Amino acid sequence: MLNNYNSLAQPMWQNGPAPGEFYNFTGGQTPVQQLPRELTTMGPYGTKHSTASSTTGTSVLGIRYDSGVMLAADTLVSYGSMARYQNIERVFKVNKNILLGGSGDFADIQSIKRNIDQKMIEDQCCDDNIEMKPKSLASWMTRVLYNRRSRMNPLYIDVVVGGVDNEGTPYLANVDLRGRSYEDYVVATGFARHLAVPLVREKKPKDRDFTAVEASELIRTCMEVLYYRDTRNISQYTVGVCSVNGCGVEGPFQVNENWTFAETIKGY
């Protein structure tokens, strides 16, 4: 019965650890782990995630009216506090149903815009005549931005998504760098949250939506106020309009400047 018994003690651990090392539970086979591209760029002292923005765009304002949406943003991209790039559009046409406006780090805006363009190409490759809707894009962006935030390497952007669905229903939403989102008849980023949103809410009729003419007038007034009050704004801006008739970006337009009221401002 004991003829085949090996009296020699077997090692307790196969592939056991060397002194000062850890046990290799994979038996010497180390799986290849593909890290996300933004986590693999090593510097001389390790990986450094960006913690601040260098080239930034300021406010984006979006207003929903009875048959569509309007988005507006100035054309300035600042380098720190310097008005470096003064002819850069920050309102984009995504497809015939969607407009996108971005503020924050402009490099991150370009990055997410390239990803969105790639998704539009994938939709076209399916050749099923089904295009992404604004609500779908906003939902997808919440997942992307929350995923980047959870990896402690966020995209420093604050975006406005607007458009119309197949039934012609307008949609307007805001998504921030943490993936938080909300819908409303007026959304804004940057200083426009404090300066423009109260102006729009004050003019909102109680029993109906804005008309296209009313929304256009509010856009003009709000961009004028932002130019006066926000040091990162300039007088030139573009307006994106999306309705059942299609989407497009119009402009650039100029603010009607009038600085005569400055004579009465005292104390600073």
Curated annotation (Swiss-Prot):
The keyword Cytoplasm applies. One of its GO terms (cellular component) is nucleus. InterPro entries: Ntn_hydrolases_N, Proteasome_beta4, Proteasome_bsu_CS, Proteasome_sua/b, Proteasome_suB-type. It is found in: Cytoplasm; Nucleus. It comes from the Eukaryota. GO terms for biological process: centrosome cycle; proteasome-mediated ubiquitin-dependent protein catabolic process. This is Proteasome subunit beta type-4. It comes from Drosophila melanogaster. The gene is Prosbeta7.
